[in-house]
Amino acid sequence: MLRHNVPVRRDLDQIAADNGFDFHIIDNEIYWDESRAYRFTLRQIEEQIEKPTAELHQMCLEVVDRAVKDEEILTQLAIPPLYWDVIAESWRARDPSLYGRMDFAWCGNAPVKLLEYNADTPTSLYESAYFQWLWLEDARRSGVIPRDADQYNAIQERLISRFSELYSREPFYFCCCQDTDEDRSTVLYLQDCAEQAGQESRFIYIEELGLGVGGVLTDLDDNVIQRAFKLYPLEWMMRDDNGPLLRKRREQWVEPLWKSILSNKGLMPLLWRFFPGHPNLLASWFEGEKSQIAAGESYVRKPIYSREGGNVTIFDGQNNVVDHADGDYADEPMIYQAFQPLPRFGDSYTLIGSWIVDDEACGMGIREDNTLITKDTSRFVPHYIAG
């Protein structure tokens, strides 16, 4: 894995506008950063990214299978007891899943380490699957990278294939919250993939969803919604006043209820418990197990439910705060994880996001930040394969 500088396309702003990439600049700061690129060999991708991703995902599914049968685990995950049985039912029925993203730290000369699994509402999808590929094609044509360079990126192909498998005559609704440009772009991109797969689709904001007779979900025209993709966290749905309606299982939600086990950072101590010493895992503990942290060991404290680095704190071996990110999740239960520093290239720390669609590893995206904690403002940098 090498990073090097590359020229930015002169018409980047126009290319982004033409392709609906409305958030390549966020708050007047660069988000999509193509002034640099990461180069990987095919062997690095296959052995150090793709293979571990596939293995870790299967391990995660085993955790789900154990968790739905164990009330102690569900309690540790802070999942409300009201939903335990329907989560188990969702798993037994193998309610269909679409995608997820594993976040890795990798220094290039040791196994990747899983930091967390964003299995419910992962973003940076459009950038990884589509806009990054456009960059590759332009970079090859212009000679910025080798003409025969490739990219670890079959994400869009797998998404369209998965939507084909989920085909139904019933409209597939796609929803997110209002006033979130990134979320809206992600959802519209997924909607486009569904339409390429032959699905009839409709977009609606979460705030516009209604309730019909008997608690059925409806759109603005009072049509009953039977299937919906939501870029809206499952734990928020469970805590909502209408959350108990999830128990009726009238709608098919993507992601399904069983994903609440994987979208929870409590997954990390469970993985360590069931697969201790695995080379791609970091030692992790629940709040009641933090005494197991070795004296002098650096560690990270994370809320069970948090996003984009919110309320994550890094401590050194003397319990001094090394780095901290503010957020809205300070009141959530915490987990603790052995500290694995992200590799540093120049002034930036690098995080690899490895994508899974329909249980298959299929691509990646790279984020950079000036701090050790990756946040929603962290830059996205393209990659390619050569050699």
Question: For the regions a protein language model found, what residue spans apply to each?
Answer:
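Preference for protein termini
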Residues: 1-387
